[in-house]
């Protein structure tokens, strides 16, 4: 069987080597690239991200990443955001009182968690919908690895009778926040599947198999 082609978008942010290895193990033919044509040609695009929202957006814009993501989604081509790669899909992020515009694929704001201990670092369970594709075959007590202090804490996209409702997965650390979103061709996780052991490997296999 032909392996699905996946590009890891190289825009100066993200754990590219770990993500690349994890995606290869998940059955993908992986290339790391900042070339728009290569990123548009593959079956699936992964947008990683670590660090500050503003820095990630600056790096993304430098490689025309917003346009790449938008063009893929306009054609129904799958995109997966990871950690800050999920956060930048929202309208804006607020860090230390400074607001930065995101890709605006989803409405809403990424804000600091109101939690007694930050960053939220370590293993945590999530609450996924029964019909999730990403979490298919996993138990309710499955844990994933998080490292973050900011997250989207509300889902602000209004229902639309003409489109399937997004599948929302939640987690808690001081407050409830979005741990993952599955919205047509656009999916994202706040946790790091490439650092989440067998559970993360299963999630990536599920995504690759869906391409």
Curated annotation (Swiss-Prot):
The active site is at residues 83, 192, 194. The keyword Cytoplasm applies. Its main location: cytoplasm. GO terms for biological process: L-histidine biosynthetic process. The keyword Ligase does not apply. Keywords: Amino-acid biosynthesis, Cytoplasm, Glutamine amidotransferase, Histidine biosynthesis, Hydrolase, Lyase. SUPFAM superfamilies: Class I glutamine amidotransferase-like. Residues 5-211 form the Glutamine amidotransferase type-1 domain. Pfam families: GATase (PF00117). GO terms for molecular function: glutaminase activity; imidazoleglycerol-phosphate synthase activity; lyase activity. It catalyses: 5-[(5-phospho-1-deoxy-D-ribulos-1-ylimino)methylamino]-1-(5-phospho-beta-D-ribosyl)imidazole-4-carboxamide + L-glutamine = D-erythro-1-(imidazol-4-yl)glycerol 3-phosphate + 5-amino-1-(5-phospho-beta-D-ribosyl)imidazole-4-carboxamide + L-glutamate + H(+); L-glutamine + H2O = L-glutamate + NH4(+). It is found in: Cytoplasm. Heterodimer of HisH and HisF. IGPS catalyzes the conversion of PRFAR and glutamine to IGP, AICAR and glutamate. The HisH subunit catalyzes the hydrolysis of glutamine to glutamate and ammonia as part of the synthesis of IGP and AICAR. The resulting ammonia molecule is channeled to the active site of HisF. This is Imidazole glycerol phosphate synthase subunit HisH. The gene is hisH.
